[in-house]
């Protein structure tokens, strides 16, 4: 429970800081940027102290304290600036219709693909079968680790993999949070921020409802029609359809015998690849800022 309070503290610090820095932006933009900034603070600030104190509870608390100081400083320096009272300048149905279903889907996929207990066995998804082992190993091995950290499978070898997307889970583990829940919550949150940020970016860039809807659908509900090959022969053999869900590497995403590789952003990239997901959580705000929006 305390781990989720720590997460909430970083998120609140990010929201307070962005609210002070960008008072003229509407409420939805400030909320999205604030939550994104909060995750960035959670990934980076404890790391600074870990080089001296190891990646333990003290480093996490000092990181949270620094985040609070940063937020309070910005709030104090910009206390007299008027805030934009409007929540959003896009039609409210746009983020509801486009983002909410994707977030619900993502939360469900995070649940089914991350150490789901079934009859005493731990189940994962086909797309996370390999990647999750790496991320779990990094998140658990960073507890009280000296910085720069070693790769747990090769002691004495510095960890060269971008691990900040997993270190936020370590922060929560240090304060007693459940491993599975920490991965699911942070993963779903990052996916939600990517969806929301993309919709905001498209709207600010085009101010077109049709363009925003089309771009979002093409970005996240992508992959083409290759999945239709998986339905070939289903009428004659019902097990062929079941194999899509229960067989090992029988999904439509990988059919080398047909020289076909059908890839979807959500199931093949955002769900299994936490480092990419953490990067996109930062990338979308960076692009938004780059265009001066």
Pin down the residues of each PLM region.
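Internal/C-terminal transmembrane anchor helices
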Residues: 88-108
């Amino acid at each position: 429970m305390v781990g989720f309070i720590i997460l909430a503290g970083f998120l609140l610090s990010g929201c307070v800081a962005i609210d002070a820095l960008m008072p003229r932006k509407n409420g939805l933009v400030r909320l999205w940027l604030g939550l994104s900034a909060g995750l960035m603070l959670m990934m980076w600030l404890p790391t600074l102290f870990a080089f001296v104190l190891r990646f333990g509870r003290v480093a996490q608390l000092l990181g949270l304290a620094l985040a609070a100081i940063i937020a309070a400083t910005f709030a104090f320096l910009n206390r007299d600036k008027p805030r934009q009272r409007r929540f959003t300048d896009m039609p409210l149905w746009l983020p509801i219709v486009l983002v909410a279903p994707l977030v619900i889907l993502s939360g469900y996929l995070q649940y089914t693909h991350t150490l789901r207990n079934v009859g005493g066995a731990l189940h994962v998804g086909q797309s996370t079968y390999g990647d999750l082992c790496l991320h779990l190993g990094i998140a658990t091995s960073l507890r009280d680790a000296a910085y720069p950290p070693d790769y747990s499978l090769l002691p004495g070898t510095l960890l060269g993999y971008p691990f900040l997307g997993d270190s936020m889970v370590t922060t929560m583990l240090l304060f007693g949070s459940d491993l599975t829940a920490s991965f699911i919550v942070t993963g779903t949150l990052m996916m939600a921020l990517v969806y929301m940020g993309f919709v905001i970016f498209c709207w600010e860039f085009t101010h077109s409802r049709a363009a925003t809807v089309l771009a979002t659908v093409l970005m996240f509900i992508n992959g083409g029609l290759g999945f239709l090959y998986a339905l070939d022969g289903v009428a004659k053999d019902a097990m062929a359809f079941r194999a899509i869900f229960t067989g090992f590497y029988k999904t439509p995403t990988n059919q080398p015998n047909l020289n076909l590789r059908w890839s979807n952003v959500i199931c093949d990239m955002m769900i299994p690849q936490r480092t990419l997901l953490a990067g996109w959580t930062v990338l979308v705000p960076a692009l938004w800022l780059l265009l001066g929006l």
